[in-house]
Amino acid sequence: MLQTYKDQLPDYAKDLKLNLTQVLSESPSSELSNQQITGVALAVAYATRNRQLIELIFQKAEAELDESTLQAIKAAASIMAMNNIYYRFVHLVKDSEYQRLPANLRMNIIANPGIDKKDFELYSLAVSAINGCGLCIDAHANTLIKAGFSKHSIQHVIRIAAVLNGLAQVSIIENKT
């Protein structure tokens, strides 16, 4: 299915097509496993809200990931959709008093995602990149560095997000949302 999708991309999306192949593969400079790459891709697909990408990546993920991981990816995409809006506001608003106010938003899934917390952080970083929350990006990237991930691995997550976001744009242009 992935090859069929790539074959149907328009000529103007050739760079994205080639980049997709590259970012969905394991890299010697990144310690991300195939399962982590697929999980990040699915979290990003959910964050783009693009039905075509969601269906495409879900089909790959369903074959590679267990049910608890699939549920955690949905949780990461959903909780980050909430947190990224809230914390982007806190980060961007000029009144610093908002930074001192308690969020008063339930987000227990972050502490207990039902999978390895490092994987949940990878998914959260990817979704935060799509949603443009600088404060969240910094927090997740720093957590991953402290957990032992290299900057190349973090960059790999962001490259996956960037390429899939570009492909979501192609879907919109081609009316395939």
Curated annotation (Swiss-Prot):
GO terms for biological process: cell redox homeostasis; response to oxidative stress. It comes from the Bacteria. Antioxidant protein with alkyl hydroperoxidase activity. Required for the reduction of the AhpC active site cysteine residues and for the regeneration of the AhpC enzyme activity. The active site is at C133 (proton donor), C136 (cysteine sulfenic acid (-soh) intermediate). Belongs to the AhpD family. It is an enzyme of class 1 (oxidoreductase). One of its GO terms (molecular function) is alkyl hydroperoxide reductase activity. Keywords: Antioxidant, Disulfide bond, Oxidoreductase, Peroxidase, Redox-active center. Its EC number is 1.11.1.28. InterPro entries: AhpD, AhpD-like, AhpD_core, CMD-like. Disulfide bonds join C133-C136. This is Alkyl hydroperoxide reductase AhpD. HAMAP family: AhpD (MF_01676). Signal peptide: none annotated. It catalyses: N(6)-[(R)-dihydrolipoyl]-L-lysyl-[lipoyl-carrier protein] + a hydroperoxide = N(6)-[(R)-lipoyl]-L-lysyl-[lipoyl-carrier protein] + an alcohol + H2O.
